[in-house]
Amino acid sequence: MSAQDLGRDAEELADVAAAARAALVSEIDASGAWADDPVWREAFAAVPRHLFVPYYYVGVVGGYERRWGQSPDPAARERWVRGAYADIPLATRLRDGELLSSSSQPSLMAMMLVALEVEDGNRVLEIGAGTGYNAALLAHRLGDDDLVTTVDLEPDITESARQHLAAAGYHPVVVTGDGARGVPERAPFDRIIATCTLRSIPRAWLAQCRPGARILAPLATGLIALAVRDAEHAEGRFLHTPAYFVPLRGATRSEPERAQLGGLPRRARDDELFRFLLALTRGSLDPQEAYVLWEREGQPQRERYGITVSGEHEWAWLDDPEGAYAWALPG
């Protein structure tokens, strides 16, 4: 292929990407995800997601299919770029069939960024660099790369995120380390957002926050929004939406055992809100106790649950932090 042909192909692919990005923005518009803070629309319209996923995997019968932007087949390259703007999570790293890293569903990212309530001049820490796309959205919104720090455990993930960000014209601070420990050398932060699932809130995060800071993180199968009072106290409720992310990895993190659901009615076992309660109370309630509570309280929505952190203690609760239902979370 001549240089002229290569240039024409790149131009055509850029046009496809621009059209696909505009379609994604329109789709998120229609979902109402950023209705409360439409400034995020500009960020999603400007940041080229395809530059953050030079390859990704899509599920097929028997495993995964790899799509990549350097395929010699023009049709395959077009499928890659169109797929990069689908409103779905994209698997970006696998190891022995296990998902290590992904680019989250854009509409969920939009909803989370709105819920983070970012203000001009805020210093933001992202836990889970992933592809770097979310950090780019934050950097674009804030207009200052130095206000954004993103951390991930795997050096190859942070290096590729740094490269993707540079290719898109963004240069936030990318750190390799255990996200549970935060990034103390970049503190204090006004906002912390995690894109990996937690079992409890790391105390290091509170210590690195300014009073009045906000933390948004996946926990159980929901999203908790915490207001930070000081280095030892934070409290907040879950948002309404479900959220499924790769677990936070680190030397001290371990996966909980799966709950045994034998003997429970099928409708409860299959109910997403009941499974949220199971995940939230694992280690405190057995499934039968959780089922009795769930039925007694009218199958509560996520917004009725919350979390309180006070010194060395951390607990989840239903309706009221000081109410009848409270369950300790792992420290």
Enumerate the predicted regions with their spans.
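Class I SAM-dependent transferase core
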Residues: 2-125, 134, 157, 318, ...
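Short, solvent-exposed coil/turn elements at secondary-structure transition points
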Residues: 58, 178-180, 221, 242
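SAM/dcSAM-binding transferase cores
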Residues: 2-20, 222-331
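Conserved nucleotide-cofactor-binding alpha/beta core module
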Residues: 101-218
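Surface-exposed loop/turn and secondary-structure junction residues enriched for glycine/proline
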Residues: 55-56, 84, 88, 93, ...
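Conserved, well-structured beta-alpha core segment at the onset of a catalytic domain
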Residues: 5-34, 189-191, 195, 199-202, ...
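Generic structural hydrophobic/aromatic packing signal, biased to beta-strands
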Residues: 24, 85, 138, 174, ...
